[in-house]
Amino acid sequence: MKLFAELYLDEDVSALMATLLRARGFAVLTAHEAGMLAQDDPAQLSYAVQLERCIVTHNRVHFERLHAGYLRSGREHCGIIVAARRNHYELARRLGVLLNSLTADEIRNQLLYI
């Protein structure tokens, strides 16, 4: 069991977010670092699943659909966090609170909003 969820940032999430979260001690991988730029949302989520990472995105509509599809088909993911576009520092703070409040197992298969 992992205590903290490891994150995968979709390409629409700023690289600054990775820097801010790493400074707080969280394991973060960006789509850019992974060579996953220009991949569609299903591919992004599938990649996060392969790496056993929770995906962070600003793309609410597409990931709500993907989450529902995973549930219907009995597939599992490591969590989807939909983040409203806001100040990077505030968003990093909110993610930090969430990650310090829930274990990786508690985030698994959840669609969370911050």
What residue ranges belong to the model's regions?
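Acidic, PIN/NYN-like endoribonuclease modules and their adjacent C-terminal/linker elements
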Residues: M1-E11, A15, L20-A23, M36, ...
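N-terminal start-of-chain detector that recognizes signal peptides
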Residues: M1, F26-V28, L51-T57, A83-R86
